[in-house]
Amino acid sequence: MITKNIDENLISVIPEDSDDLLNLRRIIKENDKIIGDTTRVLKQDKDYSRPDKGERIKVRIALTVEKISLDDVLDRLRIRGTISESSNESVPHGTHHSFILKINDGITISKKKWLPFEKNLLESSNNQVGFVLVAIDTGDSGIARLRGTHLEFMPNIYSGSGGKRYKTNFNIEKFFEQVQQAISTILKEGDSIVIFGPGETKKRFANFIQKSQNLQKFKVQVVEGIDSGGEDGIYTFTKSNTMKEIMSDSKLAKVSSIIDEVMLLANKKSTKFTMGFDETFNANQMGAVESMVFSDKAIQDDEQKMIDFLNDMENKGVKMYSVDSSTDIGLRVTGLGGIVSLLRYSIES
């Protein structure tokens, strides 16, 4: 999340992914003020004429928040409230309006007092490391950007190579150029590029992009042991031990380790973990939760209840990670009841 502190009450934000939208859902409360650009339909009253359909104009307003909700399917946040200020005198104050906040939209949040955990949520969003994953062979290349635990895919790029059975004038450098251009569109400052796939193509591609002036500032890493290219190669990598080793500081690697530990404890019949909302809620009441992973499914079941629960855990210092169905790990957590946690000590169920 891109943030800018204006003064002690005002902070401007631009969410960069679905994790950021979730954090804003946890931060924005009833009676906060949201300032941003929107559109309103203005109608002109004219005597002796047909009803005016009105003109849609762009206007900057301040909205006093009454209700806020996530729309997980469309990756957006709906903020409802009443208009308290506007840049156009034709927009009446006190009328209801909704902001639809999407990824890369900007707003300013005004609070009478910012709580420490709210500021921490903004700062934690700024510290996430990004990885561009490239699963390449001579036939095609899968490309995805991993930020936090969210995996965003680009369409596969096909080389046009005819394979061993056909004689073609295949130019692999043209294929590499296409893949490089695609990577350049999603790379962000501080990202690393991780390249894998069968055979020697991955090394040849790594050498190719390291000659590019535009990509020289990015760290490039070639990974062995992932023997498939395309989208399948990306999924294979995110489930591998290699991912945990080379991306040990990433959220996905940490979450993967937590899930592995939960499954190990379950096999040992240990009571030092929880699965599902009720078990985790009870453990949190005792202050026993050390780290917790929850899926987007848990939010959808009862949004406000879950938001209150997450904020309570944040205040208790629990390490929390959100996952979604873009990764195999997210699907596993959903299958385990949407929430799993590791405990500081065993508790009786």
Swiss-Prot record:
Cofactor(s) named in the record: a divalent metal cation
Xref: InterPro entries: eFR1_2_sf (IPR042226), eRF1_1_Pelota (IPR005140), eRF1_3 (IPR005142), Pelota/DOM34_N (IPR038069), Pelota_arc (IPR023521), Ribosomal_eL30-like_sf (IPR029064), Transl-rel_pelota (IPR004405)
Coiled coil (residue ranges): none
Keywords, sorted A to Z: Cytoplasm, Endonuclease, Hydrolase, Metal-binding, Nuclease
Alphabetical GO biological process terms: nonfunctional rRNA decay; nuclear-transcribed mRNA catabolic process, no-go decay; nuclear-transcribed mRNA catabolic process, non-stop decay; ribosome disassembly; RNA surveillance
A molecular function GO annotation: endonuclease activity
EC code: 3.1.-.-
Transmembrane segments: none
Record's GO cellular component terms: cytoplasm
Comment field on protein domains: The N-terminal domain has the RNA-binding Sm fold. It harbors the endoribonuclease activity.
General function of this protein: May function in recognizing stalled ribosomes, interact with stem-loop structures in stalled mRNA molecules, and effect endonucleolytic cleavage of the mRNA. May play a role in the release non-functional ribosomes and degradation of damaged mRNAs. Has endoribonuclease activity.
The family this protein is said to belong to: Belongs to the eukaryotic release factor 1 family. Pelota subfamily.
NCBIfam families in the cross-refs: pelota
Subunit structure: Monomer.
Name this protein carries in UniProt: Protein pelota homolog
Source species of the chain: Nitrosopumilus maritimus (strain SCM1)
Gene that this sequence comes from: pelA
